[in-house]
């Protein structure tokens, strides 16, 4: 069984924001990644302990009256999450830290991300925004409410490519495969453009450019970094990049 998850929050930074809406919808799927049954929606709002900002109200559609005195059912939400073999969100790098901070009993589960782990272009889609993907698939929904986003996600997971494979099947394959987080520690300032062009992003906390690559791409990435970023004359302040293996249990954190 899998669960589709979405959160609405008071901010983009997990250390400064709080969940104000959590939605979970369980679903069953077969060995081919075809969804065979969709369960009921579970949705909670939660009072963050302070008034919502106008920006939060505009983005989420939630008001102070919607969340006043409300709490997430921690026991039920944790039970649902732990009952699943995979937790799917459309932007797991955002949703997972919020969920695990709020529901500590749901830490260490296998997560997948339909935003970053699906090759949407090869499936004939432009862009990766949830609403835009759904429109291209022929559906319309009200964005920025957790329950609506979860339902939209489930519909996308059911979508089939020309060869019959579902989005969920592709996602599960990517989720189960180990990958590497690559940190270009000590890269010179002048290397930022080539790193960015290769898909690296800046992590202000680690103060390093990083990317995630498939397990079988490590050798090629090591060679590229050695010749482009860490070669003599490139100005790197470290001898080599850092590679950390990640799996579905610790990815997106």
Sequence positions of predicted segments:
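Conserved non-catalytic scaffold segment of RNase H-like nuclease domains
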Residues: 1-109, 123-143, 234-237, 244
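Residue-level "edge-of-site" marker
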Residues: 70, 147, 208
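HAD-like small-molecule phosphatases
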Residues: 78-79, 85, 96-100, 117-120, ...
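Short, acidic/small-residue loops that bind anionic groups at enzyme active sites
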Residues: 108-118
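Acidic, divalent-metal-coordinating active-site segment for phosphoryl/phosphodiester hydrolysis
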Residues: 148-156
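Acidic two-metal-ion nuclease catalytic site recognized across multiple nuclease folds
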Residues: 159-253
């Amino acid at each position: 069984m899998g669960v589709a998850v979405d959160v609405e929050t008071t901010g983009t930074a997990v250390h400064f924001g709080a969940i104000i809406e959590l939605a979970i919808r369980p679903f069953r799927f077969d060995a081919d990644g075809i969804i065979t049954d969709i369960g009921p929606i579970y949705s909670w709002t939660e009072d963050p302990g302070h008034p919502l900002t106008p920006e939060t109200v505009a983005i989420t559609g939630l008001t102070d009256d919607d969340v006043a005195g409300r709490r997430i059912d921690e026991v039920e939400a944790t039970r649902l999450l732990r009952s699943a073999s995979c937790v799917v969100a459309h932007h797991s790098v955002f949703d997972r830290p919020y969920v695990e901070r709020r529901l500590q009993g749901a830490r260490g589960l296998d997560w997948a991300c339909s935003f970053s782990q699906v090759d949407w272009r090869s499936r004939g889609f432009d862009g990766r925004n949830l609403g835009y993907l759904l429109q291209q698939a022929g559906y319309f929904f009200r964005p920025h409410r957790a329950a609506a986003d979860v339902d939209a996600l489930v519909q996308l997971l059911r979508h089939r490519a020309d060869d019959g494979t579902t989005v969920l099947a592709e996602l599960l394959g990517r989720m189960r495969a180990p990958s590497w987080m690559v940190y270009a520690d000590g890269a010179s300032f002048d290397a930022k453009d080539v790193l960015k062009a290769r898909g690296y992003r800046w992590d202000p906390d680690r103060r390093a450019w990083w990317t995630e690559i498939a397990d079988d791409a490590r050798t090629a990435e090591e060679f590229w970094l050695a010749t482009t970023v860490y070669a003599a004359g490139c100005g790197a302040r470290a001898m080599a990049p850092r590679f950390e293996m990640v799996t579905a249990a610790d990815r997106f954190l």
